[in-house]
Amino acid sequence: MSDPAGNRPKTEKELKKEAEKAAKLAKFEEKQKKLAEKKAAASDKPVKEAKAKKEQTVEAAEPVDQTPTGQRKKIDGEIPAAYFPGYVESGWYSWWEKEGFFKPEYIDKLNPGSNPADSFTVCIPPPNVTGNLHVGHALATTVEDTITRFNRMHGKRTLFNPGCDHAGIATQVVVEKRLKRERGLTRHDLGRDRFNQEVWHWKNEKGDVIYDQFRKLGASVDWDRAVFTMDPKMCRAVTEAFIRMHESGTIYRSNRLVNWSCALRSAISDIEVDKKELTGSTLIAVPGYDKKIEFGVLNSFAYKIQGSDEEIVVSTTRIETMLGDSGVAVHPDDQRYKHLVGKQCIHPFIPTRNLPIFADSFVEMEFGTGAVKITPAHDHNDYEVGIRQNLPFHNCITDDGLISQGCGEFSGMKRFDARTAVIEALKEKGLYRGKEDNPMVVPTCSRSKDVIEPILKPQWYVKCAHMAEKAVAAVANGDLQIIPEFHKATWNRWLESSRDWCISRQLWWGHRIPAYYISFADGREQPLPEENYWVSARTEQEALAKAAQKFQVPEAEILLKWDEDVLDTWFSSGMWPFAVFGWPDATKDMDLFFPGAVLETGHDILFFWVARMVFMAQELTGKLPFKEILLHAMIRDAHGRKMSKSLGNVIDPLDVIRGISLNDLQAQLLGGNLDEKEIAVAKEGQARDYPDGIPECGVDALRFALLSYTSQGRDINLDVLRVHGYRKFCNKLWQVVRFALARISDKPEQKPTFEINLKSATPTDLWILSRLAKAVKETNEALKAYNFTQATTVTYNFWLYDFCDVYVETIKPVLYGDNTTLRQVAISVLHKCIDTGLRLISPLMPFISEELWQRMPRLDDSDYTSPSIIVAQYPLTQKYEKYQNEKLEAAFEFAQELIGKVRSLRADYDLKKTKITMQILSETPEDESMLNDISAVITTLTFSEKVSILNKCESDKIEKGSAHIACGGRCQVYINLTGIIDVPKEIEKLGAKLQKNQISVKKIGDIQSSADYEQKVPVDIRALDQEKKATLEKEIENITAAIAQLKALN
């Protein structure tokens, strides 16, 4: 993932070095500050500064915010000496909420009569009420909130709509596990109504926690519009949608194969199926079995041919399903079996069943024996063959995973016990032909960990072909944008081959299907297919009327049974973008906020949720649900592993925000649903990754880190150390604003003005204003393009490298000097940069930006009339264009290169505390003029006593005993070392360092040249060896050059 300074991933070693560099820089700045203070007149030192300096001698205590909830935070006192995330984050959110800043109506107060076309809507992807939010939710919420805040500050009527999803199967499983663990009960012990009461209790408990987490993350949502997918208005919308789609024929009932979890006794969706890839024989734990079950093998057995001594050998990975076989298929071109086509096989265990041998081109002649057993009721491919060949369908596995009646001696056995029993019985009959390893994929239920069985069930389906065509067309013609664009291929591939959607689930928790099965009071025969005896209705009375009309009988003759199944969770969540606004009613909110602007979510549910929202919206409203689909990558741990509770690497965003000890982190594992072995593994993983726990980072640092990781299309390997690095960035912001506040006062020369006196501004003032203008332009462009990595990079670089490292350091002599005109300009520029910079980062880091912005003095301009930064105007590119100065920026870029080289030379000679004199010999008159303009910057940032700019004709003025640096062919830099260093001693010291590095290089070279190095040493270790060697060789080159220079001084 890219970081604010570049695009290459940073190693832990690099992050550590970066932290050390930051610490050194902080020390350097402090020394510079003290030196400047000594030189300044005592009377010019503000009382505040003296007090702050005194406080720095002791460790600062975290202040406590005592502002009553909902009131504007009290920040009248002096700014605290250090940045404390908890203190900064307290108070603001409740005030924002109470003032109504998050409500779309707030913009109407500011701009009465604003155009509804300026509305901007984001519906939060509703998290499941199965537990707390994880860091993946934090990423999504941060991205969505950043977009919302950015548009709000641009004056749009924004709505970020919150909510939670009932998550049918996931929530039911969690509650069932808790009931079993805590009270030893099953849902069947309670019954449907009492069990659902337990789930509602869970929802109320977890929903409050989830909403509190959203608040902690700074989500600027309109809480008055929060929706739960089982709220009455959602229930009404779901019922209405089902009935309309059923009556139009889009929803229908059919007997088809479904993904069946025997442990849950329910069909599950494709997204709830995990796929275990096996390379061969593997033992897998299956719920309900004491011993692990073997998978990844191909068993072969023979069917005898009726009326013949011949046999045909078939192979299968699920030999127990031979009890449901309906036939044997061979390829029409397979000469080995042509004479058997049309004949019958004898089933060895079910004498009444003969199996036809037939030709079908789907058979792969080279796989196994080339003959395939066909089990239409338990295999998706076989189902299609069974339909095509008109074969009978034999269910051999029951809903709870037992062998069905009618399967001979195996009836009533557990399915995998029958697997072993069938093999033994085949051996006894001389029909078993052995087994071999077979790479395969085993589908398992993500909720119960059970092995999925394809089972034939009458279910409700949605016809998807026509909706999929419209969804593909919407993307193709540009009405619907997918970002990043490479996901379009996935969109098209899925939708162009989409199957009808099974929407019924055999659960108790969820939207009960508004359909009724019709039978007759007189018990008459019902000859039509089962699907013909269903009606959908809002009430039982309506169903009765519909049934009577359908069969032209009196209502008194009708018996109704309400379908006990519930709808797939994706059905109700597929209606989320419009049902939350009151559909099917034509509400004001529907008019203002639907369709939405953008849908942001993970790419893993592009088909399962996003496509279905497009389906449902177009089908029921005739509109697309949103204009853009923004997809983020998956978050993994720092090692690139998928986050899993059993690995102990799932990160709770609140733990990162507040910090947590290792003991408390591990204690959390005991409150989950992990078994003892999983807890032990998870604890080991946590101890390895977080030996000292997780440090307090604060929400602004977490948000900024997550946004910096969002390089489009890449998985995110989240490293908490990096998040903590951004807490240090927050501290940098805090300290620079604190520095500015100590120097701003009501004195004319220390009071900032909105209009800056550019004629009196120094080149440094003009340069930082140009850099500010560029930051405003690039941040606006990045956020409009959803390029959050670029937005964090631009703002980080401006604040840290341009403003703090260069501008603030350079103007310190001006602020402590006697020139009141220059001081007043510097104060105004300082204020302008801080105010603008805080507004730039407000959507990204809302808490620290509000805290610091509120502490800054307000100026006489419309930009400063807003009560809060979150409703202030975002910096507009056109307002800052007047400050752009490419020529000056190029000059400073050159100066920074020169300063870097001088600092490196100072480090080589250990001149940390020594003032130097420097001469710069320019090659051209233009460069001489440019260097004279920026000499003050060079003087300050190289810690020089004096810097002289010479032209190339003045080389005779170069002082003897000077070290030399060439700078890009444009100038030569000379640093006078006479009397500053002990040359022989320095040569000796550098010689020792040179020898040490040469020994290290030789050792690495010897290791690399060993005979088995390429074969035995992993690629990543070899890369590290080469990197270390290259670094040492570069150091050797620099030391050698330094020694040569020192010798020349003698």
Swiss-Prot record:
Q: What are the record keywords, sorted?
A: Aminoacyl-tRNA synthetase, ATP-binding, Ligase, Nucleotide-binding, Protein biosynthesis
Q: What is its EC number?
A: 6.1.1.9
- GO-annotated cellular components: cytosol
Instruction: Give residue numbers for sequence motif 'KMSKS' region.
Output: 642-646
Residue numbers binding ATP: K645
Could you tell me which residues belong to the region Disordered?
37-72
Query: What protein is this chain from?
Result: Valine--tRNA ligase
